[in-house]
């Protein structure tokens, strides 16, 4: 392939147009531009080669490895159409043509590129050579499209936990690594949430879920651990703040056609009687903002059974419809299809949690002594809870508790 063709095919990407915004691919395009300019000045060419290699070497020394990963993770309209079973013949032909070119590009070396440009590569002999290898990109990409329901595409292939910014999901690079195996106690409660999540992943009807209970009982940890546990099965978690509830309908529209399954997670949810966010959540749970997408469920945690902060002012106000208003607010929790209660642990459950955590953290202390000290610690910390148990065990591990 001549240099002009290399450059034209690279700049003429349509399906994989987004690759040109990749910093490494952009530097490669700048290098082919410099070579095609046929400028005999060596310094600008050295600069272009060095800039590309510096960008590539920050990730890997192998162009084929980098480019193949970038191709497989790029979100394209073809993969979206294929996931919906609507890939047209025109798009399929364009996809296969570009994959064939990108496969050749994976095997491109500096010497091959210089030869295509009819340049004397001895002038650049002092520069390092990147590695290259051709892969069967067409087969790999077709497999990725078939697995889109579990592995996803675009940012959803790289990350499984997200927050919301300006109405868009934004990846969390370092999510909480919480594991279900690290959460002793509350197995019956947790299994209800897990079963509902499995139904969501299977494409079966799944409920919106309210995890209610005392602070520190593991409600939020349960949701985060489930997201980690089932990420490989196609589950993604988007955390929505209470002041962002009005953005959920737009998020649902964005995600409805995605082959992955999504939990939109609202942590520590509660409302006051004049809270505008109440109406937004009510509309979402009732489905009055559009049909419920089968691949999305709303999970929320709250320390309040009815999700409402009641004050003396609320009860003695002059609103003629005060009772009806309060009843409507208190009935919001009933609109969740599944409510799971996490109660503060009694002494026996607290002891069982402590024993399991002590094993996980390799605490070498007689259990009787451990329980006595933990009970005293819990009294100072405001009462028994899994969070208090974990804090105590971590202090034992660090040597603070002896």
Segments (PLM) and residue ranges:
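Pre-Walker A (pre-P-loop) alpha-helix and adjacent loop at the N terminus of AAA/AAA+ ATPase modules
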Residues: 175-208
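Short glycine-rich substrate-engagement loop in P-loop NTPases that contacts/grips substrate
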Residues: 190-194, 231-259, 273-279
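Walker A/P-loop
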Residues: 208-238, 251-256
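Conserved catalytic/switch belt of AAA+ P-loop NTPases
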Residues: 256-257, 272-319, 324
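Walker B catalytic acidic pair
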Residues: 267-269
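C-terminal alpha-helical "lid" subdomain
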Residues: 343-402
């Amino acid at each position: 392939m001549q240099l002009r063709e290399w450059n034209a095919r690279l700049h003429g990407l349509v399906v994989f147009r987004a690759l040109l915004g990749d910093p490494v691919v952009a530097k490669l395009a700048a290098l082919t531009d410099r070579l095609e300019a046929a400028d005999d000045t060596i310094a600008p060419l050295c600069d272009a080669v060095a800039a590309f290699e510096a960008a590539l070497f920050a990730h890997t020394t192998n162009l084929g490895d980098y480019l193949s990963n970038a191709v497989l993770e790029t979100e394209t309209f073809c993969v979206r159409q294929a996931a919906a079973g609507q890939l047209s013949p025109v798009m399929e032909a364009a996809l296969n043509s570009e994959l064939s070119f990108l496969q050749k590009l994976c095997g491109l070396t500096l010497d091959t590129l210089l030869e295509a440009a009819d340049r004397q590569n001895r002038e650049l002999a002092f520069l390092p050579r990147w590695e290259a290898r051709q892969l069967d990109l067409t087969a790999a990409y077709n497999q990725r499209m078939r697995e889109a329901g579990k592995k996803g595409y675009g940012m959803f292939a790289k990350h499984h936990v997200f927050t919301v910014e300006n109405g868009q999901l934004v990846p969390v690079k370092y999510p909480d690594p919480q594991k279900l195996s690290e959460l002793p106690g509350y197995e019956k409660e947790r299994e209800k949430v897990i079963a509902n999540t499995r139904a969501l992943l299977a494409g079966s009807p799944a409920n919106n879920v309210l995890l209610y209970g005392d602070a520190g009982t593991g409600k939020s940890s349960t949701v985060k651990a489930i997201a980690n546990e089932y990420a490989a099965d196609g589950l993604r978690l988007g955390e929505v703040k209470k002041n962002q509830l009005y953005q959920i309908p737009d998020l649902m529209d964005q995600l409805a056609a995605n082959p992955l399954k999504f939990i939109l997670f609202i942590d520590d949810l509660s409302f006051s009687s004049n809270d505008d966010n109440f109406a937004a959540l009510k509309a979402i749970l009732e489905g009055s903002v559009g049909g419920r997408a089968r691949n999305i469920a709303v999970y929320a945690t709250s320390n309040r059974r009815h999700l409402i902060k009641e004050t003396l002012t609320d009860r003695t106000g002059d609103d003629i419809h005060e009772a009806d208003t309060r009843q409507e607010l208190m009935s919001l929790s009933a609109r969740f299809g599944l409510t799971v209660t996490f109660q503060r642990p009694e002494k026996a459950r607290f002891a069982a949690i402590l024993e399991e955590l002590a094993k996980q953290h390799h605490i070498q202390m007689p259990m009787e002594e451990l329980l006595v000290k933990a009970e005293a610690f819990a009294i100072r910390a405001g009462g028994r809870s899994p969070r208090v148990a974990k804090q105590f065990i971590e202090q034992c591990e660090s040597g603070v508790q002896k």
